[in-house]
Design a protein with these regions (language model features):
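Bacterial N-terminal signal peptides
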Residues: 8-18
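N-terminal regions of proteins, emphasizing targeting and processing segments when present
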Residues: 17-19, 113, 136-137, 147, ...
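N-terminal small/polar-rich segments of proteins
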Residues: 23-137, 169-222
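Local beta-strand/beta-hairpin segments that build beta-sheet-rich folds
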Residues: 74, 142-182
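Positively charged n-region of N-terminal signal peptides that target proteins for export
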Residues: 1-5
């Protein structure tokens, strides 16, 4: 994920990507459908609408200075997961370091995980274990925003909540089949939600990259 910010015409670009998998299709992340953006002025989001396509998403938050009079810019990125064993999903971030505390910080970008749902009839429903969104990421930052003690907008979880490779989700197997290829209906979908509230930031340009990784997770019987 990359973020780029400019004074008065703040442009925030997030690029989501997936780390190369070493587990074949036994553990897999792909696009979960077309991402959406609301509340943006001159903003956009691009991604793959096909659930068998790679997860590569570019988000342009557009104008995020007070010239954007909307309360928040919200982006929802559906992410499809497939596994035939217990799994965990981790996210790592690089970039977005500003020495000036009045410039955009990682803590200014809300980030949460919501809306788990089956991806078709071959998605596995387990009765002995559930899919767990790790604290503090189980929230929609766009509806949980508040004004902090420092006068800046705060969220229950943000990009600053990521430290190294941070596990955000884990659970039991996701797929009924053992196909070596992605199918249209063989897993689960979760929504990664990003929120940025238009406000005053010191001028500058920033960038960051988010990498999503799926790997074998803790024991979770199905």
């Amino acid at each position: 994920m990359r973020l780029r910010l400019f004074t008065f015409a703040f442009l925030t670009v997030l690029i989501l990507a997936v780390a190369p998998a070493t587990f074949a299709q036994a553990l897999d992340i792909s696009s979960g459908g077309l991402p959406t953006i609301t509340g943006a002025v001159n903003g956009s989001v691009t991604g793959n609408a096909n659930v068998t396509g790679d997860l590569v998403v570019t988000i342009n938050f557009g104008e995020v200075s007070p010239l954007n009079t909307n309360s928040v810019v919200k982006v929802v990125v559906p992410i499809a997961l497939r596994s035939n064993q217990p799994y965990q999903v981790a996210v790592s971030m690089s970039g977005l370091t500003n020495a000036n505390s009045e410039a955009l910080q990682a803590s200014d970008v809300g980030f949460g995980l919501q809306n788990p749902r089956l991806l078709g009839g071959a998605g596995q429903i387990c009765n002995q274990s559930t899919h767990i969104v790790r604290s503090p990421f189980n929230n929609d930052p766009a509806v949980s925003a508040a004004i902090g003690a420092n006068g800046r907008v705060s969220y229950p979880s943000t990009l600053a909540s990521l430290s190294g490779s941070t596990v955000i989700l884990s659970g039991p197997e996701l797929s009924k089949n053992n196909s070596s290829k992605r199918q249209q209906s063989d897993g689960w979908v979760f929504d990664a939600v990003f929120a940025l509230t238009p406000q005053f930031f010191v001028s500058g340009v920033s960038s960051a990259t988010l990498i999503f990784t799926i790997s074998p997770g803790p024991n979770a019987p199905c």
